[in-house]
Amino acid sequence: MATSSTSSTTSLCFPATSAAGARTSFRTTDTFLRYRRSRQLTRLKVRKAVVRSDLDRDVSDMRTNAPKGLFPPEPEHYRGPKLKVAIIGAGLAGMSTAVELLDQGHEVDIYESRTFIGGKVGSFVDKQGNHIEMGLHVFFGCYNNLFRLLKKVGAEKNLLVKDHTHTFVNRGGELGELDFRFPVGAPLHGINAFLTTNQLKTYDKARNAVALALSPVVRALVDPDGAMTQIRNLDNISFSEWFMSKGGTRTSIQRMWDPVAYALGFIDCDNISARCMLTIFSLFATKTEASLLRMLKGSPDVYLSGPIRDYIIEKGGRFHLRWGCREILYEKSANGETYVTGLAMSKATQKQIVKADVYIAACDVPGIKRLLPSNWREWEFFDNIYKLVGVPVVTVQLRYNGWVTELQDVERSRQLRQAAGLDNLLYTPDADFSCFADLALASPEDYYIEGQGSLLQCVLTPGDPYMPLPNEEIISRVSKQVLALFPSSQGLEVTWSSVVKIGQSLYREGPGKDPFRPDQKTPVKNFFLAGSYTKQDYIDSMEGATLSGRQASAFICDAGEELAALRKQLAAIQSIDSIGVDEMSLV
């Protein structure tokens, strides 16, 4: 099986480059052409003719019966002095912060070292016109901060609602489901989903039910804040350790929870904090729509980052692409306080010093480590950040000349007149990619191409074993694993492929790491942080990034008078220094 492609391994602070096209052929056999699905497929719906795409329904109300920290109330109108703000990083956290500050009347400039915005939710178009993503982006029904942002910028129609099921694809094309479609909502719809799932055997389902019944999830039904406190206190153990101590089985972890953990945090249940998984479970138990999934109509740059960018520009904000921060300039006052005096920026051979009243680092974990002055590690606050590490992830796109996930009708899977297959996020315990989707079905605006078939986007987690491999080898391995999951795709060819490698993506939400996450407000008076790794009640995710931006903005507005006073103080010091320089030159 021969393939050819090229790509570059990149860190999160620089553009990821993608792979060129490749063809991979499989020999057709009459056996697999006659392949028929089992009785499970009778439960699957045919793709909907009309797809719901608004945010006015099927969204969890996080204002009531939910931990207060997950969805802050609307901020009061800011009446303080207008501030000049410089944001490093045009990812979702940076743009969320910018939107909030612009709405409060501040002046905002965003600096991004890449040629495109969006960070981990960014995408770009290659020379052949293919949209290349940094990863697979799925929106839970409890992403209220992100939904609020999308409605604010006029992008509420850009998400497509999927069937309320979580589908597991097992080796040989056998499907399992957590089917949340039920006449009664939370918590009964979830109880029904777990009791009737065909992904686990009866014994494992029973032990699973016992473990969940003994969890803080039950308390969340009546006391969400108390349950969240309990969940935070479980951060120091892994989910596997907690789950099995409550009676759960190793089979349940391997066949159901590991794929979910990989999809959430890119690490398995033995390595992910119990806090991370139980945060999600508590929302699934208390909010009917929390487990309902949405995906973008098309590429993130067009349907997610694009509308936010347009809103920021319309409000007077400015983007400065390809401008990277080389150094944070700072001084100490006579009373020992540290404050930032500027940012040393560069773009190719150009250099400049950016001055502002407020400086915000909206970076990922490796980005903030590179940015912080080494002397600042004398503060425990900043030193703790170096105890966090990112998880490597590899995202692979495979374009086929047929419909890989169409399991009911082999002939239909070979025709290219109409899209066919499973239109949802898909999990698997039997491949190196724990979650994947056919974007030609799930996000058709940019990924469905007339005369072409499936575009599988597969997220390889953990990505460590794949990082050193050439793209040809990665594509070959993933193609074989796709065939093992979908034997009926025997004979379909890979007509194009791409590989994006990110050395450190989400921070590794392992046991005991939550205390090292920093607040958005730092010991440096005019320097703030934003990013999904920073302290917020949700996990490292798009929702967490958006929430961190709201929290950073709130801290800045609360300190508006103090920051304006610091501006005057710094201006006076600069004036005195310039007078001294002038006098020296006269002498």
UniProtKB/Swiss-Prot annotation:
Catalytic activity: 9,9'-di-cis-zeta-carotene + 2 a quinone = 7,7',9,9'-tetra-cis-lycopene + 2 a quinol
Disulphide bonds in the chain: none
Keyword Acetylation belongs to the record: no
InterPro entries: Amino_oxidase, FAD/NAD-bd_sf, Zeta_caro_desat, Zeta_carotene_desat/Oxidored
Subcellular location: Plastid, Chloroplast; Plastid, Chromoplast
Single GO term (MF): 9,9'-di-cis-zeta-carotene desaturase activity
Alphabetically ordered keywords of this record: Carotenoid biosynthesis, Chloroplast, Chromoplast, FAD, Flavoprotein, NAD, Oxidoreductase, Plastid, Transit peptide
Cofactor names: NAD(+); NADP(+); FAD
GO CC annotations on file: chloroplast; chromoplast
Transmembrane helix is among the record's keywords: no
The enzyme's E.C. designation: 1.3.5.6
General function of this protein: Catalyzes the conversion of zeta-carotene to lycopene via the intermediary of neurosporene.
NCBIfam families: zeta_caro_desat
The family this protein is said to belong to: Belongs to the zeta carotene desaturase family.
Protein's recorded name: Zeta-carotene desaturase, chloroplastic/chromoplastic
Phylogenetic lineage: Eukaryota, Viridiplantae, Streptophyta, Embryophyta, Tracheophyta
